[in-house]
A protein has these predicted regions:
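Proline/Glycine/Serine-rich low-complexity intrinsically disordered segments
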Residues: 1-184
């Protein structure tokens, strides 16, 4: 956001949730993606068969700094030992792989790439509803940020986004996952 506000970049496409706090600083496109919350653990973990957030009770957990996964989701785990937030997704995954934590909560694309890099991890998807983490639409709607008042850029981006289908977005996400460093 600071790079957008200073004019160093025109826009940022980086999995940013469109929150009221962020929208006070920058403008956003319409949402282009809705994040899915998942949990990663090791296949031999006591939590590997968890079917709900309640099943994660007592876990040592972490996630990435500045994310809803850390700020909103982890506190919902009863009696969790919440470690400090990790600076990056790779650091979060190293914490899990090294045994520093039992679980990490993240988004599906990060988790899917991690499964390629760490075959001893397993992905837990609680499928929404009562078994899942409780988040608002604001927490999971992802948009493109741009400098406040740049209505021409906002309109142009929204016009392009309006031509795309959910299948288009999912195909692009799959392509991005396949080429990111975690999946190599």
């Amino acid at each position: 956001i600071p790079a957008v506000m200073s004019g160093d970049v025109d826009c940022v496409i980086a999995g940013q949730s469109i929150t009221a706090e962020r929208a006070a600083q920058v403008d956003f496109s319409n949402p282009y993606y809705y994040a899915s919350i998942v949990t990663l653990t090791k296949k031999d973990s006591a939590y590997a068969n968890a079917a709900s957030v309640a099943d994660l009770a007592g876990a040592t957990a972490t996630s990435q700094l500045g994310t809803i996964w850390y700020d909103t989701c982890l506190p919902q785990i009863e009696n969790a030992n919440i470690l400090p937030a990790q600076e990056t997704a790779p650091a979060m995954l190293v914490a899990l792989n090294s045994g520093a934590c039992d679980i990490v909560v993240t988004d599906r694309p990060t988790a899917q790439a991690a499964l390629v890099a760490y075959p001893d991890f397993t992905l837990l998807d609680f499928g929404g509803g009562d078994n899942d983490f409780k988040v608002s639409e604001e927490d999971i709607n992802i948009g493109i940020s741009m400098k406040k008042g740049n209505t021409a850029l906002q309109s142009a981006i929204n016009e392009v986004l309006s031509t795309m289908t959910a299948d288009d977005y999912n195909a692009m996400m799959d392509d991005a996952i396949s080429v990111q460093p975690l999946s190599e």
